[in-house]
Amino acid sequence: MKTKTKKAIKQTFVIAAVLVSVFIIVSFLALERPDSHQFEVSRTLISEQVWEYKPTVEKYAKQYGVTKYVDVMLAMMMQESGGRGNDPMQSSESYCGERGCIDEPELSIKQGVYYFSQTIKQANGDLKVAIQSYNFGKGFIDYINDNSGTYTQEAAINFSQKMYNTSSNKSIYTCLREEAKQYNACYGDIYYVRDVMEYRDELAKE
């Protein structure tokens, strides 16, 4: 009996030691997991395609003197296309006056960076005006200068309403957002600045 009892106690001790070890390992992994998960969420908010284009954006940012805005332009790419397609910066209209004329990503990025360099210059360094002008066109800069003097959400909505209401062919526009319909502001994206700035802030964490 004594031998069996000692053997049973020994087995119990071994099992307990194994369970304690497993518990410690699982607890350690649980503590580590949140940080890893946060990193994964952070990375997936910005698509891998956008990250892959970063060297190209940096190259043309240097060429056009806007290197400090690389994160902004990557954020704009994320908003425009998520980095997908042959025109990731959606630069065709500023390049040739119509959609779909660019079918080469590098040309899209070159034109997009160049166009942004022009908007930031004409906006006298007002970043939000420059960003919204990338979406609305440079006419938004003149509108701001004649009205509010700086970017506001209200100014973006009013400009979109004006351009949509005075258009001779409204069929070419679609409200990108449900919330824009209530304002009848279907020209461009009235919340472009808000979303681009959110992407930029996410990029800045990396």
What feature does the model see in each segment?
Residues 2-51, 63-64, 99-107, 118-206:
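Non-catalytic cell-wall polysaccharide-engagement segments
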Residues 53, 57:
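Peri-catalytic and regulatory segments of divalent metal-dependent proteins
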Residues 58-66:
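Extracytoplasmic/periplasm-facing segments of secreted or lipoprotein envelope proteins
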Residues 67-84, 91, 109-113, 130-137, ...:
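Short, functionally critical alpha-helical segments immediately adjacent to catalytic or ligand/cofactor-binding
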Residues 86-89, 144-145:
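Short, solvent-exposed loop/turn and secondary-structure capping segments
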Residues 89-97:
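Short linear capping/connector segments at secondary-structure termini
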